[in-house]
Every structure is written in C-alpha cells, then in structure tokens.
Amino acid sequence: MPSSKRTAAIIVAAGRGLRAGAGGPKQYRTIGGRTVISRAMEAFCQHPDVFAVQPVLNPDDLSMFNQAAAQFRYRPPANGGATRQASVRAGLEALAADAPDIVLIHDAARPFVTPALITRAIDAADKAGAAVPAIAVTDTIKQVDESGAVNATPDRAKLRIAQTPQAFHFDMILDAHRRAAREGRDDFTDDAALAEWVGLTVATFEGDAANMKLTTPEDFVREEARLAAALGDIRTGTGYDVHAFGEGDHLMLCGVKVPHNCGFLAHSDGDVGLHALVDAILGALADGDIGSHFPPSDPQWKGAASDKFLKYAVDRVTARGGRVANLEVTMICQQPKIGPLRDQMRARIADITGVAISRIAVKATTSERLGFTGREEGIAATASATIRLPWNDKGRDT
C-alpha cells in the first residue's frame, strides 16, 4: 500500500572515493555496464513513494553526473561539502523549501539498493522517526588496543552492520544537522550517529546483504563477478542492412564520416553498419527491428544520426538488467576500403555503446564484383550481437 507520507531521497555523491582506485570518483565507475551512481539512483527515481530525489555532488563532477543520470528525473544537484556530514546537510537544506515528511539518506557508493529496502525504510521512519537498515554480524569481532593486541570480544548478538538508506522525519534530522554545525561537530560517520548524539532513538529494520558499499578495488572485482554470474541467459541476434548510393560527398559508416564521391539514399544518415548492429541487438532481445522502433514514415528521423538508434538499442538491454557482451559487423562493398578505418570504427562503436573495444569487431569483404555491391551501387552490412540477461528458473528474463 502506498505511503501517505511525502518522502524525498538524498543521494550523497560528493566524495572522491580514492580507495577504490581507477583514478576518479568511484560513483562514476561502471559496474555491470552501468555507472555506480546510475544504479544507486534508479530504485529511488522509480519508487512510487519517493516524490523527489536530491543529488549532492562535487561541482567538478557535474558533467559526469549529467551523463550518468540522463534518464532520471531529479532536483537540481546541491554542491557537497568537505565532509560527508556537510554534504548531507547541503542536501537537507536544498529540500527545506519544499520539506518532505520523511527523508532517506543514501550513499551513492551502494548501487544495489532495492525497491523493497526503500519501502522498509519509509515504513520504519514513519513508525520510529529515525531508523537504519542493519544486518547481523556473523563473524566474531575483536576489539584491540593501540598495539593491535585483543583486549575485548564484543557479543556479536548485540552488534549490527549499518547500511543506507537511513530514514528520518525530515525536521528532526535537519535540526540535528544544524545543531551539529553550530557546535562545530563534523566527525559523525553516518546520520544515525548524529541522531543519537542529539538524543534521538534510532530504530533498526531489516537490511540487505547485497546492499554493500563499494570501497576498494577488490569490491569492484567481486561485484563484477557476481553480476556476470547472474546474467546466465545468453542470447544472440543477427542484423542486415543495405543502402544504395546517391548524391553526396561522404558516407556514414559505423559512426565514422568517410569522404566519398557519393552519399547514401536513406531516410536517416544511412549508416548501414550501425543499422545492422541495431537490428542484431533488437533481435537478441526479441524486441522487433529498427523499422518498428524508428519507422521511416516518421519525419522526426529524417536525416537522424544513427548513433541515436544504436544507443537506444543498448539502453533496451540495460533496462532489462542485461549487458551487451559482443558486437560484430561485416561491411560488404568494393569501395571505400574499410581496413584503414577499422580501428576508428571500433572505437566509435565502443564510445556509443559503452562496450569495451576488445569486444567489438569490424570486418569487411567484397562480393567479387557480383551483384549490386560488386557494381558499386551501394553497401550492405551484416551484424551479430551477443547479450546477457538475468535468468530465472522459468527461462524468462526478470
């Protein structure tokens, strides 16, 4: 049953994440073919009980964020502070003019948050005022002194691992953050600790072991392997396209502008290589063909750049929780010569799709002067795509 409380979410994404390596903020690294922050935001942006999502960013990351979150609706990002605590306060202040009843505060570095966990967070905050998701500690914990010697063994039955989203009545947590700022306290590692400091009782609710925080390079390696293992529904598709030559001074081939003594006769830019790849991906999805998604009778696609079509097809895979594993396209033509352009074309396809260039093949052949390609009347292209989708015991993607 939908909640009657107005709920907003703050996505804390201003940190640098240097321990994760890779030379940039970890929230913009990809995992399973998608950025960490995109995965973290999706469940909140699509949750029926969350009316607003407030990102908090380092302003230097704005262009990366805009690209990663392009498919979502969210409030204008707030600028983060020098600490996580300062960043959360910035997000709370950004929401204050249209204050929600409940606010969920979530770390962007936890990309596997689920709608069910969000619902539990809202319910818990509604009942308790302040609540955190928690999971039981299964290992024995040792407390050590300055030398590293064990001096205590806490009772693990009384210990919990706190996660996010942490959920609060909005006014309560905003007041707590403002008080901490006034008193110069900026050392709280999560919002529950700050709430405890001002005297609030913080409840716990069932967390999710999969809702882990990505911190180290090893975390990324482990989660990549876990995601890959879950994508057991391996599918292939094929595509074919052909366009005749017409007037012009260049051809678009696999996203590359190739000078030539003619152009293509086509409704869009006529890129036979990308069109064949689009059909291959859609075929693997059993999701129609390029003509059903971009009908030539629709004037909005007149002269359209075909990279839009290919990006759309890849996004269809991503929307179903999958990834593109391999792409191959073969150009059939006498001219132009594809060999000198091969790596440029592979790089362009990689840029459009987000697929590693090592998983993209561009090949070429001729028809030995036979048929319309042999007479240099046009170009044909064939393509294949391999995709991986989530599998369940009924053989359907989830």
Curated annotation (Swiss-Prot):
Enzyme nomenclature, EC number: 2.7.7.60, 4.6.1.12
UniProt GO BP: isopentenyl diphosphate biosynthetic process, methylerythritol 4-phosphate pathway; terpenoid biosynthetic process
Site-annotated residues for Positions MEP for the nucleophilic attack: R156, K213
Gene Ontology terms for molecular function: 2-C-methyl-D-erythritol 2,4-cyclodiphosphate synthase activity; 2-C-methyl-D-erythritol 4-phosphate cytidylyltransferase activity; metal ion binding
The protein's annotated pathway: Isoprenoid biosynthesis; isopentenyl diphosphate biosynthesis via DXP pathway; isopentenyl diphosphate from 1-deoxy-D-xylulose 5-phosphate: step 2/6; Isoprenoid biosynthesis; isopentenyl diphosphate biosynthesis via DXP pathway; isopentenyl diphosphate from 1-deoxy-D-xylulose 5-phosphate: step 4/6
Entry-linked CDD domains: CDP-ME_synthetase, MECDP_synthase
Binding site for a divalent metal cation: D241, H243, H275
Swiss-Prot/TrEMBL site (Transition state stabilizer) positions: R19, K26, H267, T366
Record-stated family: In the N-terminal section; belongs to the IspD/TarI cytidylyltransferase family. IspD subfamily.
Identification of the protein by name: Bifunctional enzyme IspD/IspF
Organism (species): Nitrobacter winogradskyi (strain ATCC 25391 / DSM 10237 / CIP 104748 / NCIMB 11846 / Nb-255)
